[in-house]
A protein has these predicted regions:
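Feature of Fe-S/electron-transfer and energy-metabolism proteins
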Residues: 1-136
Length: 136
């Protein structure tokens, strides 16, 4: 079973190492023979926690951050792929104080979807307004 790991790909996260972190995660997973699906999502706007790495678990996405390349091996040692405890563990992403108090409308999908994937956009009800308009 593949484990889904999210690492942001927007310019702010990339400028502080998100690409390097994503590559390190992929390399470490391969080294440990752990099958992962690495999704490059948009940032949730928590720049003080970037790169913010999220892991999809049965309870929801669990957040770790800010993650540096030097943290990746210890994240795997702590079983972060199933939400394991680690000094960078922040909890369920949706329960983080900064996000919990928000009702996002315009940016509702930011940090959740891959910003360049039409399949992801459609899966999260993208084009719903267009679909409704065309049916009338």
């Amino acid at each position: 079973m593949s484990i889904t790991i999210y690492v942001p790909c927007d310019s702010s996260a990339v400028s502080i190492g998100a690409d390097r972190v994503a590559k390190a995660i992929a390399k470490e997973a391969e080294k440990r023979n752990i099958e992962i699906q690495l999704v490059r999502n948009g940032s949730r706007g928590l720049y003080w926690l970037e790169p913010l790495v999220e892991v999809l678990t049965e309870k929801g996405r669990k957040a770790y951050g800010p993650v540096q390349v030097t943290d990746v091996a210890s994240l795997f040692d702590a079983n972060f792929t199933v939400g394991g405890a680690h000094p960078l563990y922040l909890g369920l992403t949706e329960e983080l104080d900064y996000l919990k108090k928000q009702q996002r409308l315009t940016f509702a999908r930011i940090g959740i979807t891959d910003p360049v994937s039409l399949e992801d956009y459609i899966r999260f009800d993208g084009y719903q307004g267009l679909n409704n308009a065309l049916k009338q």
